[in-house]
Amino acid sequence: MQDVNRLKLVLVEQKKTSKWLSEKLGVSQSTVSKWCTNSSQPDIETLARISKLLGVGMEELFNKKFMESV
């Protein structure tokens, strides 16, 4: 599977954990873990919430190569 998002990297850059994000979003840690490993992807509304929580633009959450392919 292609790496679609950079969520794991952005969390590290922001010094945040997947546990922190799961608590803020009200989802399980396993869900956030799947997003971080690109085994599944959050929906667009959740991506918008994530970008707001992390203070980054939504485009920063996507892998550049993926964005170039769409």
PLM features: residue spans?
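Short, charged recognition helix plus adjacent turn
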Residues: 9, 15, 34, 60-70
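The alpha-helix within a helix-turn-helix
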Residues: 11, 22, 51
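Recognition helix of helix-turn-helix/homeodomain-like DNA-binding domains
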Residues: 27-42
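DNA major-groove recognition helix of helix-turn-helix/homeodomain DNA-binding modules
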Residues: 45-60
